[in-house]
């Protein structure tokens, strides 16, 4: 007896969640998140979307990495030790060069309405509450990448 199985739904989803950078290659993302499980899971989701991810644990490391490397999107947790995401974002914006123009995404479990409504629009381009599922993360990063294409 022949049995034909239909493709697994997640195979279709994974294919549709592929991202590409404005330059046509794999998007390069910087992820700053102090919580190990969240950092590991978020990085894995981003890698599954075709992104190259550099993950750091606090804002100071994010600022240093942004000054030394070029990224297509920088994702910053708001509440981190040593340097919080807001301070890191403002430092990145003020450093000039390619980093200053890189789309910044706020990621926080305590995301205030002021972030979502644009009160920090001069600092962050996109705000995403945690926990974010794969589809929400994909849409936010996709929007950030498209924003970069428009401004480039």
What do the PLM-derived regions correspond to, one by one?
Residues 33:
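Conserved acidic carboxylate
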Residues 105-107:
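Hydrophobic/aromatic residues positioned on beta-strands within the core alpha/beta folds
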Residues 80-83, 92:
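Receiver (REC) domain active-site loop signature in two-component systems and cognate sites
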Residues 70-75:
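Active-site beta3 strand of CheY-like receiver
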Residues 55-64, 85:
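Helix N-cap/capping motif at the beta->alpha junctions
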Residues 40-48:
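Charged docking surfaces used in two-component/phosphorelay signaling
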Residues 87, 110-130, 135, 139:
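Alpha4 helix (beta4-alpha4-beta5 surface) of REC/receiver domains from two-component response regulators
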Residues 1-19, 142:
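C-terminal catalytic ATP-binding subdomain
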């Amino acid at each position: 007896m022949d049995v034909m199985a239909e493709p697994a739904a997640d195979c279709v989803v994974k294919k549709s969640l592929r991202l590409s950078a404005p330059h046509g290659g794999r998007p390069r993302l910087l992820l700053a998140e102090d919580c190990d499980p969240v950092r590991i899971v978020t990085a894995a989701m981003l890698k599954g979307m075709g992104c190259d991810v550099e993950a750091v644990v606090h804002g100071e490391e994010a600022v240093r990495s942004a000054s030394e490397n070029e990224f297509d999107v920088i994702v910053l947790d708001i509440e981190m030790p040593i340097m919080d995401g807001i301070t890191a974002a403002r430092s990145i914006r003020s450093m000039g060069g390619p980093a200053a123009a890189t789309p910044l995404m706020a990621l926080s479990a305590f995301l205030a309405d002021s972030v979502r409504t644009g009160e920090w629009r001069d600092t962050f381009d996109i705000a995403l509450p945690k926990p974010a599922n794969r589809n929400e993360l994909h849409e936010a990063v996709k929007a950030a990448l498209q924003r970069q294409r428009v401004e480039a």
